[in-house]
Amino acid sequence: MQTLHQSQLLQNPAEAANNQSESDAPPKQVAQAMERLNQAARVIADIRLGADRILEAMFVASQPRHTDMPLQLFLREDASMRQHLQDLRLIGKKLEESGVLTESLRSRSNSWGLHMPLVCPDGAVVAYAWKRQLAGQAGASAVDRTRLALKAFTDQKRRFFPHIDDGLKMEPSSKKHRASHLLLENGREEPVDYKTLPDIQSRLEKLVPSVKVSTYGRLNWLKRANSLPGSGSDDPTEASKPIFQSSSKLRSGLQTEVVDKIAVIELSFPSLFRAIVSLSPAGSVDPDAVAFFSPDEGGSYLHARGFSVYHVYKHITEHAATALQYFLGFGTGTALYSLLLWICSFESVFSKPCTKCGRLLAMDKKSALILPPLHRAYQELPLALNLDVCEAYHSSCSQDDT
């Protein structure tokens, strides 16, 4: 009989191990659960480090000059992250099997179903019940840390790569409420999500009557840029026709397929500047680039990622790139409208003195040129009713530099 029992154990070693695990004393089960929780904590730490390495590889790969090393590093870290996540799933299953985390407990009103320790008449179960209580709390803490790590990774991705839409660009309701309250106190309108180009253009023309807004497809804008005269004349009859020029045409029933082709928005202030905004994808309200040019410039370099030959507009373009990223950080609902309204604040680029030093012209340290205030505050101008509230700064006086 003993020989038969030994042969059965040799034939089913896995089943024997499971039976032994189930028959372990409570202290040993708790020790195993705590060890698995420690393993989960180490895996979570590896996941957080891997997320930072992936972000670093993505940032290096986005630079103009880079080798294949960032791509190899990204692939290696991606495989490592997948393995860590798989290990974390296996540890979680083991914790569920040991009774630390169970579906029945998590489905109750208490998030993790943690109960007060059981007190038996002889007091034998008291210590084990307390240890199980602590193990359950540690399991909940491990899951919370994982959730926080994934949230930190998502926040960093949205900060450094805002063009990657993960569907999570929604502000908390409390934050929106506070922002709305501050805007109303400062004489500004409450934020509204402008979902279509006609709505944005109509609202902009009402607030800034002096601006001329035109929209184009990418090919039409290329023809328009190449046909612009190299003089101060800005007669639209000398260039190719835009898709539409006025919001009245939009409201009169512009076809949807025409709007879907709009990829370039031109804001023009006669004798001041011309701003080019690119939309990606075409027909959306998601800006991805912006550039400023002189009204007398023309050529193929006039596009949203180009640079003017004049220092003034080149400096404004560099500053506009920062403002664009700021507006995109608040979601695509108001990013385009806020950007266009901020661009209109440069109508006083050659007449408004610096808010900090009070002078109109000052020496720019980087370029060694005498320039007007080329920075406009964008942090507090999401939906202002009056563009005069937008403060002007020289680059040396700008709050962004300080």
UniProtKB/Swiss-Prot annotation:
Its main location: nucleus. InterPro entries: Mediator_Med27. One of its GO terms (cellular component) is mediator complex. It comes from the Eukaryota. Residues 1-30 are annotated as: Disordered. Pfam families: Med27 (PF11571). Residues 1-23 have a biased composition (Polar residues). It is found in: Nucleus. Residues 28-49 form a coiled coil. Component of the Mediator complex, a coactivator involved in the regulated transcription of nearly all RNA polymerase II-dependent genes. Mediator functions as a bridge to convey information from gene-specific regulatory proteins to the basal RNA polymerase II transcription machinery. The Mediator complex, having a compact conformation in its free form, is recruited to promoters by direct interactions with regulatory proteins and serves for the assembly of a functional preinitiation complex with RNA polymerase II and the general transcription factors. Component of the Mediator complex. Belongs to the Mediator complex subunit 27 family. This is Mediator of RNA polymerase II transcription subunit 27. It comes from Arabidopsis thaliana (Mouse-ear cress). The lineage of its organism: Eukaryota, Viridiplantae, Streptophyta, Embryophyta, Tracheophyta.
